[in-house]
Amino acid sequence: MPKITESNLIAGVQIVEPSMHGDERGFFIETYRREWFPLGREMIQGNRGDRKAGAIVGLHYHLHQADYWYVPYGTCRVVLHDLRTGSPSDGVTQTIDLGARPDGTHDHRGIFIPPGVAHGFASLTDMTITYLVDNYYNPNDELGVAYDDPAIGADWG
């Protein structure tokens, strides 16, 4: 069973540390399971993005879509900013590094991002990100905030 913790900065953001099983042949890891998020909605689409080191993607947000991100290769810095009026963490910014660590290990954490939380990432190395979403693409629910907005004050690495 994975260890799932709620962010201590942004309400509703959940960080998953999945269990890993392996031997000299390699390893197996379950990166997502619906039952881990009993209050979440069903993820209906999976996507993959490959980025070169130095790329910045975001910030964007959705009013009607949650995301679940996992980085199987490389390292990224995830930047989150709570835009939900009335949320206990409204206006809070958080950064989380996912993927490979400087010591050569890989943390294998995933992150659940609820609707209304702006999200983006900087590729600290060449990387791959997979993301599951609970709604199909809707251009009317693709909203954005400038990645360098001083009110957000994000550290992109």
Language model region names:
Residues T105-T125:
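Conserved SET/PR-domain catalytic core that frames the SAM/AdoMet-binding pocket
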